[in-house]
Amino acid sequence: MAHRPRWTLSQVTELFEKPLLDLLFEAQQVHRQHFEPRQVQVSTLLSIKTGACPEDCKYCPQSSRYKTGLEAERLMEVEQVLESARKAKAAGSTRFCMGAAWKNPHERDMPYLEQMVQGVKAMGLEACMTLGTLSESQAQRLANAGLDYYNHNLDTSPEFYGNIITTRTYQERLDTLEKVRDAGIKVCSGGIVGLGETVKDRAGLLLQLANLPTPPESVPINMLVKVKGTPLADNDDVDAFDFIRTIAVARIMMPTSYVRLSAGREQMNEQTQAMCFMAGANSIFYGCKLLTTPNPEEDKDLQLFRKLGLNPQQTAVLAGDNEQQQRLGQALMTPDTDEYYNAAAL
């Protein structure tokens, strides 16, 4: 394998300081070298266990430490999750992501999580989970069950991290990513813009991600969703150009990774989202609620895809599942469709 040079903080800072149009031009050039520029990867996300999390992440309404009005729910039954996955596939989804609000999975929950992964995979869907910290054995068990992707965000730079979270160390997050990678599972890891961090912190976050032994296959860039009752509810709004700039730098630094627009997309107008796609974003969550924060309504997503001439990526799945690719394309590109699965409606 060819040696991959490591990024330095000064190099990343130089990217952030580039004139925006020059930065976008470079990011789009890099993007076109590695991806079909009009294709966007589309995922569906379901919260399989909501609220009552013991962590103190200051941005998160799922923490038991904050009064946000969120009703806690137990881990969903396996069949409930699989029924949701069936609906997702019937409507054209190719990847099904399952998220649970806890610090780490208990051993008693592992058999149920394995059954969820196995059931989703049996449908010909890609399976993704975000469950918090994993042990080496837990990562291997999920890999053996067939898990394709594991999401575990770094959130921000190591230097700013302690201002946001105290119940889980930065190194613990890095260790989980290493265990996931060693188990043979693809890594999904990114962060949040708008926590009160500086541009240097944004550079530091992307530096950590890009300098991993293997960069994440998927890099979600979230815009803070300010939820009443959380400590960050009164944070300043994120400037749209600052967010777009972060997307562009992520694309340049991690040219073969999918850069995903995740939480906060409902706060962006069409023009901001369009510039994010121009900056190299090529993945979204569609037609669902991002755990406990809203995503744009499906019809708005469809309209934007049509306006920009974007198409859902034709993801490689099990043989015989080409029909679901066609259904997703039809749903995204055909006006007035309402058949797409909405996880938030269950």
From Swiss-Prot:
It catalyses: (4R,5S)-dethiobiotin + (sulfur carrier)-SH + 2 reduced [2Fe-2S]-[ferredoxin] + 2 S-adenosyl-L-methionine = (sulfur carrier)-H + biotin + 2 5'-deoxyadenosine + 2 L-methionine + 2 oxidized [2Fe-2S]-[ferredoxin]. Binds 1 [4Fe-4S] cluster. The cluster is coordinated with 3 cysteines and an exchangeable S-adenosyl-L-methionine. Binds 1 [2Fe-2S] cluster. The cluster is coordinated with 3 cysteines and 1 arginine. PROSITE patterns: RADICAL_SAM. One of its GO terms (biological process) is biotin biosynthetic process. Coiled coil: none annotated. GO terms for molecular function: 2 iron, 2 sulfur cluster binding; 4 iron, 4 sulfur cluster binding; biotin synthase activity; iron ion binding. InterPro entries: Aldolase_TIM, BATS_dom, Biotin_synth/BioAB, Biotin_synthase, Elp3/MiaA/NifB-like_rSAM, rSAM. Keywords: 2Fe-2S, 4Fe-4S, Biotin biosynthesis, Iron, Iron-sulfur, Metal-binding, S-adenosyl-L-methionine, Transferase. The keyword Metal-binding applies. Its cofactor is [4Fe-4S] cluster; [2Fe-2S] cluster. Gene3D superfamilies: Aldolase class I. Pathway: Cofactor biosynthesis; biotin biosynthesis; biotin from 7,8-diaminononanoate: step 2/2. Its EC number is 2.8.1.6. [2Fe-2S] cluster binds at C97, C128, C188, R260. It is an enzyme of class 2 (transferase). [4Fe-4S] cluster binds at C53, C57, C60. SMART domains: BATS (SM00876), Elp3 (SM00729). Residues 38-256 form the Radical SAM core domain. It comes from the Bacteria. Homodimer. Belongs to the radical SAM superfamily. Biotin synthase family. Catalyzes the conversion of dethiobiotin (DTB) to biotin by the insertion of a sulfur atom into dethiobiotin via a radical-based mechanism. NCBIfam families: bioB. This is Biotin synthase.
